[in-house]
């Protein structure tokens, strides 16, 4: 789908594009990681972006697991956003603590989540919210 198919209103000099955004509220339990991955996969299929499924589902799974492991959130929110260009993934939680990429010990079985995310995405970051934070990821085109 090209950008012209997404035009909703505006002029040729100042077009406004539709922004597709979907959220899924998730309980903070391990089994919900699969729900987050299925949610992202279904949106990418609906948008015809099947080339992004593998990386996106790995990333959202890592974001979910990091939030589950490092926060005491009562609820997590996975979001996927597309405006006809790049795909943006988000994970919202109740903690104000921002993630960081720690030195990786490849002998251990855990501790590589943000390292994996950084390797698969174009850019990632986080922002504080009124009650917690959002960790966001932009996928390469």
Describe each PLM feature range.
Residues 34-61:
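Conserved short strand/loop->alpha-helix "switch" segment adjacent to the catalytic nucleotide/phosphoryl-transfer site
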Residues 1-23, 67-141:
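Conserved beta-strand-loop-beta-strand hairpin that lines the nucleotide-binding pocket
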């Amino acid at each position: 789908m090209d950008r012209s198919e997404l035009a909703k209103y505006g002029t040729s000099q100042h077009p406004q594009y539709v922004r597709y955004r979907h959220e899924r509220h998730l309980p903070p339990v391990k089994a919900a990681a699969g729900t987050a991955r299925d949610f992202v996969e279904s949106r990418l299929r609906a948008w015809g972006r099947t080339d992004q499924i593998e990386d996106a589902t790995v990333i959202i799974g890592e974001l979910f697991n990091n939030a589950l492991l490092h926060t005491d959130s009562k609820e997590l929110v996975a979001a996927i956003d597309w405006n006809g260009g790049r795909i943006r993934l988000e994970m919202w939680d109740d903690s104000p603590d921002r993630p960081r990429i720690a030195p990786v010990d490849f002998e251990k079985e855990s501790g590589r989540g943000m390292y994996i995310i950084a390797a698969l995405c174009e850019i990632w970051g986080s922002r504080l919210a009124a009650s917690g934070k959002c960790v966001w990821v932009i996928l390469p085109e």
